[in-house]
Amino acid sequence: YSASETGVDYCVGMLSIDEDADILDPRLWKKERYPVLKTCEKLGIYGPGHNSFTMDEDGNDVMVYHARTEAEINGDPLYNPNRHAMLMKVKWDEAGRPVFSYENK
């Protein structure tokens, strides 16, 4: 999910639930304590959000998301033409949980 308004604090959070749990029971969902994807000034990625998942032609899991390449928003933050579609390969840990990293290429 996306959270924290529209500026550099905009980020992606994650909810998870055990595989055999009742997905309709909101008490069983677990919210990650920290964002799984956030601004990375070093790489010039600001306010990532609105993600979805797909596979590339080689069968690798890929996350598609948008982010800005500038820290400052000019004009209306809800109509900002500086958001760009970006891709990230998603890797998985031993427990089957996604590992999100700008280093995943």
Regions found by a protein language model. Give the residues of each.
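Carbohydrate-active catalytic/glycan-binding domains of CAZyme proteins
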Residues: 1-105
